[in-house]
């Protein structure tokens, strides 16, 4: 089964010599785990779309009960945030909190939108990172119950 979706990479874990295990937050399927086969190889066509905190248009396919990335095209990579260690650390913190709150296979567009807006604020807006973090945490309370 194939699925085309937009996804944000919440976590990446090196696996074998050239693969990654990715935790994705998608619009349609919620949180899911997928393998990025060969995405650590030099010149891989899916490498850019399988980076941490990258919003990508992905084609996923199910292989032996697990999802795998077939195609990944970068939609937004939040480059300005990656140049500042504090902002990048807060982005990773937001991804970690989101991963804990999201349920595998259950769509949560509110949580996805909140994380994307927070990453945009860290990347483009001239807001203090502590203010963005506080707003993110407060707004996470609603989806968390």
Q: For each predicted feature, which ranges?
A:
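Non-catalytic alpha-helical scaffolds and adjoining flexible linkers that form interface surfaces
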Residues: 1-145
């Amino acid at each position: 089964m194939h699925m085309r979706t937009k996804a944000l990479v919440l976590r990446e874990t090196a696996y074998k010599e050239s693969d990654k295990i990715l935790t994705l937050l998608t619009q349609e399927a919620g949180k899911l785990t997928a393998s990025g086969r060969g995405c650590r190889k030099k010149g891989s066509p899916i490498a850019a779309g399988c980076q941490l905190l990258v919003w990508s248009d992905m084609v996923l396919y199910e292989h032996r009960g697990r999802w795998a990335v077939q195609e990944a095209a970068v939609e937004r990579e939040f480059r300005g945030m990656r140049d500042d260690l504090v902002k990048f650390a807060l982005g990773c913190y937001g991804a970690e909190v989101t991963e804990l709150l999201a349920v595998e296979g259950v769509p949560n567009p509110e949580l996805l939108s909140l994380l994307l807006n927070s990453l945009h604020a860290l990347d483009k807006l001239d807001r203090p990172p502590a203010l963005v973090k506080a707003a993110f945490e407060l707004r996470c309370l609603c989806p968390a119950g």
